[in-house]
Amino acid sequence: MAKSKKDSGARRKKVTRTVADGIAHVHASFNNTIITITDRQGNALSWATSGGAGFRGSRKSTPFAAQVAAENAGNAAKDYGLKNLEVRVKGPGPGRESSIRALNGCGYKITHIEDVTPIPHNGCRPPKKRRV
């Protein structure tokens, strides 16, 4: 006979830390947009993607999908008391501009916008051009 697990009753309350300003990392590829909001040390507070927001296939790579993902990540990070955001954008995708606008619309003060797209000094051979 299985014993029932006894509930101790005293549960530890989860401590939420307050972070004044953080960094929003926007990774905008051609297929998807990933937004991660971190503190100054790089510890992730919240994240969201276009695919995780319910968009599938070619709709994942639209500016509207990036906007919805940025709103989801921004609203999830509000629990930490975030006020100021520094935005670092990486990649050539269509969600670059709209995700910044959506984070601004969430009520954050954007202090700095930086493009951190990696540029090769003639590194790997790029993929071949599409023939449609």
Swiss-Prot record:
HAMAP family reported in the protein's UniProt record: Ribosomal_uS11 (MF_01310)
Assigned keywords, A-Z: Ribonucleoprotein, Ribosomal protein, RNA-binding, rRNA-binding
Organism: Alcanivorax borkumensis (strain ATCC 700651 / DSM 11573 / NCIMB 13689 / SK2)
GO biological process: translation
InterPro entries referenced in this protein's UniProt entry, alphabetically: Ribosomal_uS11, Ribosomal_uS11_bac-type, Ribosomal_uS11_CS, Ribosomal_uS11_sf
Function according to Swiss-Prot or TrEMBL: Located on the platform of the 30S subunit, it bridges several disparate RNA helices of the 16S rRNA. Forms part of the Shine-Dalgarno cleft in the 70S ribosome.
Subunit: Part of the 30S ribosomal subunit. Interacts with proteins S7 and S18. Binds to IF-3.
Example GO molecular function: rRNA binding
An example Gene Ontology CC term for this record: ribosome
Superkingdom of source: Bacteria
Protein's UniProt name: Small ribosomal subunit protein uS11
Family to which the UniProt record says this protein belongs: Belongs to the universal ribosomal protein uS11 family.
